[in-house]
From Swiss-Prot:
HAMAP family: LpxD. It comes from Anaeromyxobacter dehalogenans (strain 2CP-1 / ATCC BAA-258). GO terms for cellular component: membrane. This is UDP-3-O-acylglucosamine N-acyltransferase. It is an enzyme of class 2 (transferase). The active site is at H245 (proton acceptor). Catalyzes the N-acylation of UDP-3-O-acylglucosamine using 3-hydroxyacyl-ACP as the acyl donor. Is involved in the biosynthesis of lipid A, a phosphorylated glycolipid that anchors the lipopolysaccharide to the outer membrane of the cell. It comes from the Bacteria. The keyword Metal-binding does not apply. Belongs to the transferase hexapeptide repeat family. LpxD subfamily. GO terms for molecular function: N-acyltransferase activity. Homotrimer. GO terms for biological process: lipid A biosynthetic process.
Amino acid sequence: MASYTLAELAARVGGAVEGDGSLRLDGISPLEEASASEISFFSNRKYRKAFEASRAGAVVVEPDEQVAAGRTVLRVANAYLAFAKISTLFHPPREAVPEVAPTAVIHPTARVHPSAQVMPLACVGPDAQVGARTILFPGVHVADGARVGEDCVFYHNVVVRERCAVGNRVILQPGCVIGSDGFGFAFDPEGEGKGPRHYKVPQVGNVVIEDDVEVGANTCVDRATLGTTRIGRGAKIDNLVQIAHNVQVGPLSLLVSQVGVAGSTKLGMGVVAGGQAGIVGHLEIGDGVRIGAQSGVMADVEAGETVSGSPAVPHGNWLKAMASLDHLHDMRKELRSLRREVERLRADAGEDEP
């Protein structure tokens, strides 16, 4: 198992040691579980009690964090980012073992780089390409004419359908499907003499996944009706997300679990959509937009805006509306009382109701 001195870790993440820089650490653990030979991190004030009680040999903290005398810490500008980098040192990514398992199925016209690893029961179809050092876990299917770049990891039962293209350093979690048919049907009231039917619109486009993308388990990215559905460089998509045909997801965007994006909508760079947010089709969502969890986005959103609610409105307006909900019952009672009082005054004055 790898071990590092605290000073070595500081050099790797650009931090400053307070305490014993020669302290050797052999792992990283949560504050509550870390031992004297492990490092932990503290970036959320909710966990201050755990931080103060932690037995960790060292803790990653940010520059303004107050610490008790004698506590060994590694101060960094961004504790969570430093945690990620340190964790990667202790748990480096899996490296490909160049081999093709005997039960893997590689079509004679497929091109699999000699340094790639193809595990049992994985399948690479006709004219497909798999790049250097890419790992295909059991059950992966790379279909006809698909292109897979270098240093990718496709976990169990991933499907990349025909003619789709995946860039370099892409991670596809178990069960995700790239290039499933888009949901396109034209209603035919006659049904060619057989009665009304939904006529399937052929989905003949593809999907392009750019470099450094990660797609979560059981997420589906549908192929375009015509043209390309595109996931931009560095985007991260959580589990159980639905990306419809011809959607464009901008670089560095984050889509949290159960988000749904309907057809032909374009998300700009760095868009963040909270869990279960739904975005209807044919919209333009600008760069840097933030969408609250469970929001229903029904209209274009300008760059930099934050929206919440269903239908989604500017976040400040939504907060005001939510704050009013607790008072609606009392307001209703007051309104009824005022109405009765007005009716009484009109009756006393002999006025008819308007």
